[in-house]
């Protein structure tokens, strides 16, 4: 009986409510991630049980089940080809910036708990009518697009008040937005690229509103051109317009920053995506930059 009572006391002691700083990671394929799990160093291969992750099921516009998911633990397999039906997660053979980001942000906040929410889809754009689309006032087809799938992801993630499974409700405090996107807008047309700044401002304002924190830190990843186009070397003819829009955004927003380490990255033969090592570098840089912004930008708990 004494042993049973002791065990019950231990379980009760450990099952306490936890406060988590929550980071949202979104964008298109270079946030989705083409890093290959087989390339990972040993310390990234093991699950990091202290960092919960909710990844919304990525689907195209008009499709159902976007944003389905469940809280999991950080590990390889949240890159491209990840799938969730809301009951089980099917991890893939790929990872994205979330992996090293989660490891690094946890190191930068050793006295706090961190959690990640991710929703991203390759080829998606902010410009209206371009590919799979984030434009909030979407009117094509049934009107469902990437913005809706993002909202579903948040709704599903925050619906679970016990994200670590210890039986106690947790407090989730939005702490930052990490956004790696813009290639599709830079590739589509000059008109779409020239509207990127306005579209980016609108989208980040909506993200902040959805997370109920108007001054939430935002870190952007700079898009870069591989130079692999056979005609003129430019994969994105209007890339400079989107790059300038990214610079303008962070100059005009005191709670935003741009990570430009991508300028040194090596692209895969497809001309769009990065190497496994570069995804690890990108995630770490995202973590370093968002941590710097957090001290100067107020955050509020999600209620």
Q: What are these model-predicted stretches?
A:
Residues 1-7:
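Sec-dependent signal peptide recognition
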Residues 4, 17-18:
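Short hydrophobic "helix-edge" motifs at membrane interfaces and signal-peptide entry regions
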Residues 12-15:
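N-terminal signal peptide c-region/cleavage motif recognized by signal peptidases
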Residues 18-302:
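Cell-envelope and extracellular/periplasmic
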């Amino acid at each position: 009986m004494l042993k049973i009572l002791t065990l019950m006391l231990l379980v009760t002691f450990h099952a306490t409510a936890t406060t988590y700083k929550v980071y949202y990671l979104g964008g298109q394929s270079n946030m989705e991630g083409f890093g290959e799990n087989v390339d990972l160093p040993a310390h990234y291969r093991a699950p990091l049980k202290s960092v919960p992750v909710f990844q919304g099921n990525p689907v195209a516009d008009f499709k159902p089940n976007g944003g389905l998911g469940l809280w999991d633990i950080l590990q390889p397999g949240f890159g491209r080809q990840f799938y969730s039906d809301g009951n089980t997660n099917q991890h893939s053979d790929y990872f994205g910036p979330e992996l090293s980001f989660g490891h690094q942000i946890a190191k930068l906040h050793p006295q706090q708990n961190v959690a990640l929410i991710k929703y991203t889809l390759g080829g998606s754009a902010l410009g209206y009518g371009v590919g799979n689309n984030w434009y909030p006032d979407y009117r094509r087809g049934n009107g469902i697009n990437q913005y809706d799938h993002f909202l579903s992801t948040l709704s599903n993630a925050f619906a679970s008040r016990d994200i670590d499974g210890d039986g106690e409700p947790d407090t989730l405090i939005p702490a930052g937005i990490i956004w790696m996107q813009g290639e599709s807008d830079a590739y589509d047309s000059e008109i779409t690229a020239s509207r990127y700044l306005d579209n980016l401002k609108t989208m980040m304002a909506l993200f902040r509103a959805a997370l109920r924190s108007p001054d939430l830190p935002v870190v952007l990843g700079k898009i870069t051109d591989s130079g692999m186009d056979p005609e003129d070397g430019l994969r994105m003819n209007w890339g400079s317009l989107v790059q300038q829009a990214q610079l303008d955004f962070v100059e005009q927003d005191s709670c935003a920053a741009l990570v430009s380490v991508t300028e040194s990255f090596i692209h895969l033969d497809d001309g769009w995506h990065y190497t496994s090592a570069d995804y690890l570098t990108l995630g770490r840089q995202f973590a370093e930059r968002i941590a710097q912004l957090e001290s100067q930008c107020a955050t509020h708990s999600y209620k």
